[in-house]
Amino acid sequence: MLQDGKNRMENRFVHTDILTRLDGLAETAVVSEAQILPLKHIQHIKREIEATLKTETCDWQLLKNIHPTPAVGGSPRRKALAQIRTLEQHQRGWYAGACGFISEDVSEFTVAIRSGLWHDQQLELYTGAGILTGSDADEEWQELDTKLNSMLGVWHD
């Protein structure tokens, strides 16, 4: 995955955007090297971004400024979100929010790019694929199938 140009580009879009949005809100921000996070049914490229917020910045300001990331909202943000609202026929609901915790001394969040909702005896699964210049439609559909199957695998385990 780390050698795949498309995966590297997707990851770079996200972490570069987050760092840009931290500017003005954080005293410092450090990005880790990309790593593979192996899970039972799928693997991810993972980077940690550790930031020390300015005293006048609260966690909610940070979250509002960062989300949605390009992983789920596209880039450039305003134009991409307008296009998503035009094209998608459904509400995204809980898909793609920040997942984590806030405490007095430290907070930690992740970009939640897959989610599921069990309601009224029905399971709704949400996932997406990064569409970039040069993306192959068949490969993107396969990626969606793989992601959904990994979620179903967790459900059945």
Kindly give the residue locations of the regions a language model identified.
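Contiguous alpha-helical scaffold segments within structured protein domains
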Residues: 1-85, 156
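Glycine-rich, small/acidic residue-mixed loop/short-helix segments
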Residues: 73-79, 83-157
